[in-house]
Amino acid sequence: MAFLSSGAYLTHQQKVLRLYKRALRHLESWCIHRDKYRYFACLLRARFDEHKNEKDMVKATQLLREAEEEFWHGQHPQPYIFPESPGGTSYERYECYKVPEWCLDDWHPSEKAMYPDYFAKREQWKKLRRESWEREVKQLQEETPVGGPRTEALPPARKQGDLPPLWWHIVTRPRERPM
């Protein structure tokens, strides 16, 4: 569990904010009626606000530890998990339906006419990609030593205003869900 070790690097404020958010999410699971939830959320916020200006870090750390223990004992046994979140029922469900970018090249002109702004911008990206391809490959060949490591990250742009090599897959994404 690598995410647990990152807690040592969080500031006190970040730990308090994360505890507050977790407490609100679990409170949402306990109180299904919105008005009741809002009332208890205001009470919870008031409890956190009581000690928000605490200057003594020893006391603040002790308060945080006590609050985390209270949260642990009062958490919901089956908290609500959003469907698209990790652990949710629909998490990564539509991965197999994502359409690759090259499939848009095969659209009929009448289909492309329905989204003129998108396809105009896409054509600009494709033109820029064609123009920069040779220069980017040349830059990579010059900067990569023969027999050198092939798993390192790509080098950054060397000139002001230039893009790093092979950049377009970062700035252009395929449609995430089919229509």
From Swiss-Prot:
Alphabetical UniProt keywords: Acetylation, Electron transport, Membrane, Mitochondrion, Mitochondrion inner membrane, Phosphoprotein, Respiratory chain, Transport
One CC-aspect GO term: mitochondrial inner membrane
Residues with the N-acetylalanine modification: A2
Pfam families in the cross-refs: Complex1_LYR (PF05347)
Keyword Phosphoprotein: yes
General function of this protein: Accessory subunit of the mitochondrial membrane respiratory chain NADH dehydrogenase (Complex I), that is believed to be not involved in catalysis. Complex I functions in the transfer of electrons from NADH to the respiratory chain. The immediate electron acceptor for the enzyme is believed to be ubiquinone.
Subunit-level organization: Mammalian complex I is composed of 45 different subunits.
Protein name as annotated: NADH dehydrogenase [ubiquinone] 1 beta subcomplex subunit 9
Source species of the chain: Bos taurus
